[in-house]
């Protein structure tokens, strides 16, 4: 069924709005996948806070042209599914990477974190990006480490003194 102009404009506006809020985008070719497999991918995407959309490439180019992901335009060929990471920068890449382990028909073709087009070879690096909570935990651990070492050092002085006294007592 052909889309009318109004429907196309709605799709472009929707994808453009989601892209403007997204932290990163992963694009994958889904050629040969069955509907049940795509449904399973969509369920996993909802669980992980990733917005998935299958859009005609010409509409996607229009939607992405005014966003920070305009660099993806050159990679939009073939039947593609777009994953927009809303909550974590590596969310869509992680979703596609994990799903591709069990389904070889899903091939990631391009990625973008807003700073340029990344090829599929960068999938592991983008998927390894920490979530907000993980990044905050690492930051707090970095702040906490020097204080912990200082307390440990200050505590070592009386402990060492007690061990010396115990050693002297044992020798007498």
UniProtKB/Swiss-Prot annotation:
Top-level taxon in the UniProt lineage: Bacteria
Gene3D superfamilies membership: 3.30.70.1730, 6.10.250.290
GO molecular function: large ribosomal subunit rRNA binding
Keywords per UniProt: Ribonucleoprotein, Ribosomal protein, RNA-binding, rRNA-binding
InterPro entries given in the database record: Ribosomal_uL10, Ribosomal_uL10-like_sf, Ribosomal_uL10_bac, Ribosomal_uL10_bac_type
GO cellular component: ribonucleoprotein complex; ribosome
Example GO BP: translation
Family statement drawn from the similarity comment of this UniProt entry: Belongs to the universal ribosomal protein uL10 family.
Subunit structure: Part of the ribosomal stalk of the 50S ribosomal subunit. The N-terminus interacts with L11 and the large rRNA to form the base of the stalk. The C-terminus forms an elongated spine to which L12 dimers bind in a sequential fashion forming a multimeric L10(L12)X complex.
HAMAP family xrefs: Ribosomal_uL10
Function: Forms part of the ribosomal stalk, playing a central role in the interaction of the ribosome with GTP-bound translation factors.
UniProt protein name: Large ribosomal subunit protein uL10
